Protein backbone atom coordinates (compact mmCIF):
# COMPACT_ATOMS: atom_id res chain seq x y z
CA UNK A 1 0.00 0.00 0.00
CA UNK A 2 1.37 3.40 -0.92
CA UNK A 3 1.79 5.81 1.95
CA UNK A 4 3.20 9.30 2.07
CA UNK A 5 5.71 10.12 4.76
CA UNK A 6 4.29 12.54 7.32
CA UNK A 7 7.41 14.69 7.01
CA UNK A 8 6.24 15.51 3.46
CA UNK A 9 2.61 16.31 4.27
CA UNK A 10 0.40 17.77 6.97
CA UNK A 11 -0.56 15.24 9.62
CA UNK A 12 -4.16 14.14 9.37
CA UNK A 13 -6.64 14.35 12.23
CA UNK A 14 -8.21 10.94 12.82
CA UNK A 15 -11.13 10.48 15.24
CA UNK A 16 -11.83 6.92 16.44
CA UNK A 17 -14.88 6.22 18.58
CA UNK A 18 -14.69 3.22 20.88
CA UNK A 19 -10.94 3.74 20.66
CA UNK A 20 -9.84 2.48 24.05
CA UNK A 21 -9.87 -1.28 23.50
CA UNK A 22 -9.89 -4.08 20.94
CA UNK A 23 -10.66 -3.12 17.36
CA UNK A 24 -10.80 0.60 18.09
CA UNK A 25 -7.39 0.65 19.72
CA UNK A 26 -5.91 -1.35 16.83
CA UNK A 27 -7.39 1.11 14.34
CA UNK A 28 -5.97 4.03 16.30
CA UNK A 29 -2.60 2.28 16.39
CA UNK A 30 -2.52 1.90 12.62
CA UNK A 31 -2.93 5.64 12.15
CA UNK A 32 -0.58 6.49 15.00
CA UNK A 33 2.10 4.42 13.28
CA UNK A 34 1.77 6.85 10.36
CA UNK A 35 2.46 9.76 12.69
CA UNK A 36 -1.09 11.13 12.51
CA UNK A 37 -2.98 13.13 15.13
CA UNK A 38 -5.30 10.52 16.59
CA UNK A 39 -8.20 11.24 18.95
CA UNK A 40 -9.70 8.39 20.96
CA UNK A 41 -13.30 8.54 22.17
CA UNK A 42 -15.06 6.26 24.62
CA UNK A 43 -17.12 6.11 27.80
CA UNK A 44 -14.35 5.09 30.23
CA UNK A 45 -11.75 7.74 30.91
CA UNK A 46 -9.30 5.38 32.63
CA UNK A 47 -9.33 2.96 29.68
CA UNK A 48 -8.84 5.79 27.19
CA UNK A 49 -5.97 7.28 29.18
CA UNK A 50 -4.12 3.95 29.30
CA UNK A 51 -4.70 3.31 25.61
CA UNK A 52 -3.49 6.77 24.62
CA UNK A 53 -0.37 6.43 26.77
CA UNK A 54 0.44 3.05 25.25
CA UNK A 55 -0.13 4.19 21.67
CA UNK A 56 1.92 7.32 22.20
CA UNK A 57 4.81 5.23 23.51
CA UNK A 58 4.57 2.90 20.52
CA UNK A 59 4.40 5.78 18.02
CA UNK A 60 6.38 8.74 19.40
CA UNK A 61 6.00 10.68 16.14
CA UNK A 62 2.21 10.66 16.47
CA UNK A 63 0.02 12.84 18.66
CA UNK A 64 -2.49 10.70 20.56
CA UNK A 65 -5.26 12.45 22.48
CA UNK A 66 -8.43 11.22 24.16
CA UNK A 67 -11.78 12.57 25.28
CA UNK A 68 -14.48 10.84 27.30
CA UNK A 69 -17.74 10.82 25.36
CA UNK A 70 -20.83 8.64 25.12
CA UNK A 71 -21.62 8.99 21.42
CA UNK A 72 -25.28 8.11 21.96
CA UNK A 73 -25.81 11.27 24.05
CA UNK A 74 -26.24 14.42 21.92
CA UNK A 75 -24.95 16.84 24.56
CA UNK A 76 -21.78 14.80 25.03
CA UNK A 77 -21.17 14.65 21.28
CA UNK A 78 -21.59 18.41 21.05
CA UNK A 79 -19.24 18.80 24.01
CA UNK A 80 -16.65 16.73 22.18
CA UNK A 81 -17.06 18.85 19.06
CA UNK A 82 -16.38 22.01 21.03
CA UNK A 83 -13.36 20.41 22.71
CA UNK A 84 -12.01 19.25 19.35
CA UNK A 85 -12.25 22.73 17.85
CA UNK A 86 -10.46 24.18 20.86
CA UNK A 87 -7.75 21.57 21.39
CA UNK A 88 -7.11 20.11 17.93
CA UNK A 89 -8.42 22.42 15.23
CA UNK A 90 -11.25 22.99 12.77
CA UNK A 91 -10.58 20.13 10.34
CA UNK A 92 -11.16 16.38 10.64
CA UNK A 93 -9.68 14.16 7.94
CA UNK A 94 -10.89 10.71 9.03
CA UNK A 95 -13.85 9.71 11.20
CA UNK A 96 -14.02 6.06 12.26
CA UNK A 97 -17.33 5.17 13.91
CA UNK A 98 -16.35 2.07 15.85
CA UNK A 99 -18.28 2.51 19.11
CA UNK A 100 -20.97 -0.05 19.80
CA UNK A 101 -21.53 -3.38 21.45
CA UNK A 102 -24.08 -6.00 22.28
CA UNK A 103 -25.91 -7.11 25.38
CA UNK A 104 -28.70 -9.58 26.01
CA UNK A 105 -32.06 -9.40 27.74
CA UNK A 106 -34.00 -12.45 28.94
CA UNK A 107 -36.83 -13.52 26.66
CA UNK A 108 -39.29 -13.27 29.53
CA UNK A 109 -38.17 -9.77 30.57
CA UNK A 110 -40.90 -7.16 31.09
CA UNK A 111 -41.69 -5.12 28.00
CA UNK A 112 -40.32 -1.93 29.55
CA UNK A 113 -36.98 -3.63 30.23
CA UNK A 114 -36.86 -5.05 26.70
CA UNK A 115 -37.59 -1.61 25.25
CA UNK A 116 -34.81 0.01 27.28
CA UNK A 117 -32.41 -2.67 26.08
CA UNK A 118 -33.43 -2.11 22.45
CA UNK A 119 -32.92 1.64 22.65
CA UNK A 120 -29.54 1.17 24.32
CA UNK A 121 -28.33 -1.12 21.53
CA UNK A 122 -29.63 1.22 18.82
CA UNK A 123 -28.10 4.19 20.60
CA UNK A 124 -24.58 2.84 20.95
CA UNK A 125 -24.38 1.22 17.51
CA UNK A 126 -26.52 3.28 15.13
CA UNK A 127 -27.65 6.56 16.66
CA UNK A 128 -24.13 7.27 17.92
CA UNK A 129 -22.77 6.82 14.40
CA UNK A 130 -25.35 9.25 13.04
CA UNK A 131 -24.70 11.82 15.78
CA UNK A 132 -20.94 11.77 15.21
CA UNK A 133 -21.37 12.28 11.48
CA UNK A 134 -23.88 15.06 12.04
CA UNK A 135 -21.61 16.85 14.53
CA UNK A 136 -18.37 16.58 12.56
CA UNK A 137 -19.70 16.90 9.03
CA UNK A 138 -19.07 20.68 8.87
CA UNK A 139 -15.45 20.03 9.82
CA UNK A 140 -14.62 17.13 7.49
CA UNK A 141 -12.00 17.94 4.88
CA UNK A 142 -13.42 18.73 1.44
CA UNK A 143 -12.31 17.09 -0.76
CA UNK A 144 -10.54 14.14 0.82
CA UNK A 145 -12.53 13.46 3.98
CA UNK A 146 -13.12 9.86 4.98
CA UNK A 147 -15.92 8.30 7.03
CA UNK A 148 -15.57 4.62 7.92
CA UNK A 149 -18.38 2.93 9.85
CA UNK A 150 -17.89 -0.39 11.63
CA UNK A 151 -20.83 -2.71 11.00
CA UNK A 152 -20.83 -6.48 11.52
CA UNK A 153 -21.35 -9.81 9.81
CA UNK A 154 -24.52 -9.91 11.93
CA UNK A 155 -26.04 -7.25 9.67
CA UNK A 156 -26.27 -9.89 6.94
CA UNK A 157 -26.12 -13.19 8.78
CA UNK A 158 -28.34 -12.35 11.74
CA UNK A 159 -27.76 -13.13 15.38
CA UNK A 160 -27.94 -10.83 18.37
CA UNK A 161 -31.48 -9.54 17.90
CA UNK A 162 -31.45 -5.75 18.06
CA UNK A 163 -27.69 -5.76 17.51
CA UNK A 164 -28.18 -7.22 14.03
CA UNK A 165 -30.85 -4.64 13.29
CA UNK A 166 -28.63 -1.80 14.47
CA UNK A 167 -25.65 -2.95 12.41
CA UNK A 168 -27.88 -3.36 9.35
CA UNK A 169 -28.93 0.22 9.97
CA UNK A 170 -25.27 1.25 9.92
CA UNK A 171 -25.03 -0.17 6.39
CA UNK A 172 -28.11 1.74 5.27
CA UNK A 173 -26.71 4.94 6.75
CA UNK A 174 -23.40 4.31 5.00
CA UNK A 175 -25.07 3.97 1.61
CA UNK A 176 -27.12 7.14 2.14
CA UNK A 177 -24.15 9.20 3.27
CA UNK A 178 -21.99 7.99 0.39
CA UNK A 179 -24.54 9.28 -2.10
CA UNK A 180 -25.01 12.58 -0.29
CA UNK A 181 -21.34 13.37 0.36
CA UNK A 182 -19.69 12.04 -2.78
CA UNK A 183 -20.15 15.34 -4.67
CA UNK A 184 -18.21 17.04 -1.86
CA UNK A 185 -15.25 14.69 -2.23
CA UNK A 186 -15.95 12.72 0.97
CA UNK A 187 -15.98 8.94 0.82
CA UNK A 188 -18.15 6.86 3.15
CA UNK A 189 -17.61 3.13 3.56
CA UNK A 190 -18.23 0.37 6.08
CA UNK A 191 -16.21 -2.55 7.40
CA UNK A 192 -18.12 -5.63 8.56
CA UNK A 193 -16.01 -7.85 10.85
CA UNK A 194 -16.76 -11.47 11.64
CA UNK A 195 -15.52 -13.16 14.80
CA UNK A 196 -12.64 -11.12 16.19
CA UNK A 197 -10.68 -12.30 19.21
CA UNK A 198 -8.86 -10.10 21.73
CA UNK A 199 -11.86 -7.81 22.15
CA UNK A 200 -14.45 -7.23 24.87
CA UNK A 201 -17.30 -7.99 22.48
CA UNK A 202 -17.86 -11.68 23.14
CA UNK A 203 -16.76 -11.73 26.78
CA UNK A 204 -17.53 -15.02 28.50
CA UNK A 205 -19.84 -16.05 25.64
CA UNK A 206 -16.89 -17.06 23.44
CA UNK A 207 -16.18 -20.48 24.89
CA UNK A 208 -13.42 -22.67 23.42
CA UNK A 209 -16.13 -24.87 21.92
CA UNK A 210 -17.87 -21.95 20.22
CA UNK A 211 -14.59 -20.59 18.91
CA UNK A 212 -13.63 -23.98 17.46
CA UNK A 213 -17.05 -24.33 15.82
CA UNK A 214 -16.82 -20.88 14.24
CA UNK A 215 -13.28 -21.44 12.99
CA UNK A 216 -14.41 -24.73 11.43
CA UNK A 217 -17.10 -22.80 9.52
CA UNK A 218 -14.57 -20.23 8.30
CA UNK A 219 -12.78 -21.04 5.02
CA UNK A 220 -9.58 -19.34 6.25
CA UNK A 221 -9.66 -21.64 9.30
CA UNK A 222 -8.70 -18.97 11.81
CA UNK A 223 -10.41 -16.27 13.84
CA UNK A 224 -10.01 -12.61 13.08
CA UNK A 225 -7.80 -10.27 15.07
CA UNK A 226 -8.14 -6.52 15.64
CA UNK A 227 -5.22 -5.89 13.28
CA UNK A 228 -7.23 -7.43 10.42
CA UNK A 229 -9.98 -4.85 10.87
CA UNK A 230 -7.47 -2.05 11.38
CA UNK A 231 -5.79 -2.87 8.06
CA UNK A 232 -9.12 -2.65 6.24
CA UNK A 233 -9.97 0.70 7.82
CA UNK A 234 -6.47 2.01 7.10
CA UNK A 235 -6.89 1.14 3.43
CA UNK A 236 -10.28 2.85 3.15
CA UNK A 237 -8.77 6.00 4.64
CA UNK A 238 -5.83 6.00 2.22
CA UNK A 239 -5.30 7.73 -1.11
CA UNK A 240 -5.52 4.29 -2.72
CA UNK A 241 -9.23 4.22 -1.82
CA UNK A 242 -10.10 7.70 -3.06
CA UNK A 243 -12.51 6.25 -5.66
CA UNK A 244 -14.11 3.75 -3.28
CA UNK A 245 -17.34 4.85 -1.63
CA UNK A 246 -20.63 3.29 -0.58
CA UNK A 247 -18.94 -0.08 -0.16
CA UNK A 248 -18.90 -2.71 2.59
CA UNK A 249 -15.58 -4.46 3.13
CA UNK A 250 -16.29 -7.85 4.68
CA UNK A 251 -13.42 -8.97 6.90
CA UNK A 252 -14.49 -12.37 8.21
CA UNK A 253 -12.24 -14.98 6.61
CA UNK A 254 -15.17 -16.18 4.51
CA UNK A 255 -17.41 -16.93 7.51
CA UNK A 256 -20.28 -15.11 5.78
CA UNK A 257 -20.59 -18.01 3.34
CA UNK A 258 -18.86 -20.54 5.59
CA UNK A 259 -19.15 -24.22 4.91
PLM region spans:
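Residue(s) in the substrate-gating loop at a strand-loop-helix junction
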Residues: 152
Amino acid sequence: MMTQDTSERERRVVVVTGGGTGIGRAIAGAFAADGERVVLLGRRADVLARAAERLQAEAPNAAVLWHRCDVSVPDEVEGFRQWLLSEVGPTVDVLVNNAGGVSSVPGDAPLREAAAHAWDILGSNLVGTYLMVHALLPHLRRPGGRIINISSIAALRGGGGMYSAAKAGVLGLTYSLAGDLGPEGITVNAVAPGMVLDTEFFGDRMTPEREARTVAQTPMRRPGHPRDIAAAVHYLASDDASFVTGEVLHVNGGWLFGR
